[in-house]
């Protein structure tokens, strides 16, 4: 679906990033009323290895690239790119699917209960404003 068309939907949109959200295609997940992310997932326009290869011509510098890209749920929550970090059990999501599923279910239900109170016009207006506010330019 075209991102412009998705942004015009009259119903609540909730996205959850559960693993690697990497590339321009994954960015479409941000055209939502609520964007959530598992705590050990990452979300970025390019993989850390790809970024390191381009910037430093050395994919081994992926850790430096990951830090610069701010790809973690904690970073993205602080930057306002995502709205919620969903906790995972000790050992990660794969260690207890039932716990992760319940955590995700709870977050989805809470978001939909909140969003259901808004008119379609308000949803579209807030969705547009949220997406347009992403990004930051900092001068030294």
Segments and roles (model prediction):
Residues 110-140:
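C-terminal alpha-helix plus adjacent terminal tail
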């Amino acid at each position: 679906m075209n991102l412009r068309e998705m942004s015009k939907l009259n119903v609540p949109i909730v996205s959850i990033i559960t693993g690697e959200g990497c590339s321009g295609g994954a960015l479409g997940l941000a055209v939502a009323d609520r964007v959530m992310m598992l705590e050990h997932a990452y979300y970025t326009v390019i993989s850390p290895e790809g970024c390191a290869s381009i910037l430093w011509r050395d994919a081994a510098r992926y850790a430096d690239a990951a830090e610069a890209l701010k790809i973690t749920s904690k970073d993205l929550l602080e930057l306002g790119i995502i709205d919620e970090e969903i906790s995972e059990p000790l050992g990660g999501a794969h260690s207890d699917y039932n716990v992760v599923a319940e955590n995700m279910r709870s977050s989805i239900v809470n978001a939909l209960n909140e969003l259901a109170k808004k008119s379609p016009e308000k949803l579209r207006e807030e969705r547009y404003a949220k997406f347009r506010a992403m990004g930051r330019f900092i001068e030294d």
